[in-house]
């Protein structure tokens, strides 16, 4: 009985947290996606890693989130797939997005850590989101250096594992 009660409480708390985190603005109005400077649409770009945009993993999940922002917030979205998987390949596509006016760039995965480390310095007026990684120089024992124009997001996989364990108990 305790396990069922605990599972129910955790499910309610998880649902409430998700709904609160995904809720709209407090005034009930949707954002238009404008940058506010010239009425231009915000341009959100993504660089894929070695996978494809429909890989049922980080690339697909990231792109679907950007597409939702495009639909709900009116942002302009674009993704580029590098020709290779080196830091230089990633930096080239980051530069291509930047040159096309995409100053909000999302990269899915730790493979982008060194490219974002360099990109955040080179493109100081751009904003970067690095999923499941932290920018660093690539040197041995390098410490993460998240610039003021970068957000590094790590998923709390241990929480999902805990919830799965509770659910099966």
Describe each PLM feature range.
Residues 2-25:
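Sec-dependent N-terminal signal peptides of Gram-positive bacterial secreted proteins and lipoproteins
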Residues 18-39:
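Bacterial lipoprotein signal-peptidase II cleavage site
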Residues 34, 81, 94-98:
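Divalent cation-coordinating acidic motifs and surrounding scaffolds
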Residues 44-69, 78-91, 109-112:
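Extracytoplasmic "Venus flytrap"
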Residues 87-102:
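Short, well-structured alpha-helical segments in soluble
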Residues 101-109, 127-131:
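Periplasmic-binding protein-like
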Residues 121-154:
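Flexible loop/hinge segments that line or gate small-molecule binding clefts
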Residues 153-169:
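Hydrophobic alpha-helical segments within soluble ligand-binding/sensing domains
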């Amino acid at each position: 009985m305790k396990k069922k009660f605990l599972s129910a409480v955790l499910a309610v708390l998880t649902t409430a947290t998700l709904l609160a985190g995904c809720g709209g603005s407090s005034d009930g109005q949707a954002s238009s996606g404008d940058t506010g400077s010239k009425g231009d649409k915000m341009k959100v770009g993504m660089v894929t890693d070695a996978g494809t945009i429909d890989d049922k993993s980080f690339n697909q999940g990231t792109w679907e989130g950007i597409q939702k922002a495009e639909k709900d917030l009116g942002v302009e979205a674009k993704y580029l797939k590098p020709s290779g998987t080196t830091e230089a390949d990633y930096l080239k596509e980051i530069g291509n997005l930047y040159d096309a006016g995409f100053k909000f760039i999302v990269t899915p995965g730790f493979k982008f850590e060194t490219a974002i480390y360099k990109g955040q310095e080179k493109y100081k007026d751009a904003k970067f989101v690095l999923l499941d990684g932290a920018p660093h120089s690539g040197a041995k024992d390098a410490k993460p250096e998240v610039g003021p124009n970068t957000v590094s997001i790590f998923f709390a996989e241990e929480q999902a594992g805990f919830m799965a364990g509770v659910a099966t108990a």
